[in-house]
Amino acid sequence: MDNEYLLNFFKKKNVPIIQKKRHTYLTYYGLEQQDTYVLKEGVIKTSIILHDGREFNISYINTPDIISLLKDEVSQYTSAPFNVRVESDVATFYRIPRVLFWSYVNQDQKLQDYVNAYYREKLSEAIFRQQCMMMNGKTGAICSFLYQLIHLFGRKVEAGMLIDFQITNNDIAGFCGITTRNSVSRILCEL
């Protein structure tokens, strides 16, 4: 996907930019919102709250990406598809009314192609994450998640690869469908 096209498109249209600080929420799952958000810079975590009250983490996003697009395109207001929490010191977003966003998409073929590619990519990512969690057990889910973190935050060091991002065992548990951080600690010690 051509993130530069998306960012330049919003810049040309003078779409307002907002900033959020670490551990503040941009959206809450299920609450009404009228805007579409596009991450410009920073790191965010998307998650939902399960029926038993636990948080199920969906993904970290650290590149320009459309954040809140997974609902219908005609309603002025729609419920947020998930929680979005800022994980970097600051994150910057473009904020555009949903109806105006979809108007732009319908008028611009390249933006339409971007949105179609966005949906295909998000579906592929969701299938891959589910496959990793379902087919590999808890240890495999953690290993797979750590491998995904290398692609997002990894940098080469003398001893190998360093995941240059602070993440708690509780967050790892939330990404891997594990109930407690103690289970994550035990599995990490066994690796």
Roles of regions detected by a PLM:
Residues R129-R155:
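Short alpha-helical segments that sit at the start of domains
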Residues M1-L26, I66, K71-S75:
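Cyclic nucleotide-binding regulatory module and flanking cytosolic helices
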Residues S59-R120, S124:
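Cyclic-nucleotide recognition modules
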Residues T36, I58, T92-F93, D164:
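A residue-level structural signature of the nucleotidyltransferase/glycosyltransferase Rossmann-like core
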